[in-house]
């Protein structure tokens, strides 16, 4: 997809593009 999920990991902001 074209779906992008943003999630906070500890103090690090990570993003996963699906």
Swiss-Prot record:
Keyword DNA-binding: no
Gene source species: Escherichia coli
Signal peptide: none
Location(s) in or outside the cell: Fimbrium
Taxonomic classification: Bacteria, Pseudomonadati, Pseudomonadota, Gammaproteobacteria, Enterobacterales
CC per GO annotation: pilus
Described function: Fimbriae (also called pili), polar filaments radiating from the surface of the bacterium to a length of 0.5-1.5 micrometers and numbering 100-300 per cell, enable bacteria to colonize the epithelium of specific host organs.
Coiled coil location: none
Keyword line: Fimbrium
Protein name: F7-1 fimbrial protein
The UniProt record lists the keyword Iron-sulfur: no
More info: This is an alpha-galactosyl-1,4-beta-galactosyl-specific adhesin.
């Amino acid at each position: 997809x074209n779906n992008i999920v943003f999630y906070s990991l500890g103090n690090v902001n990570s993003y996963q593009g699906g």
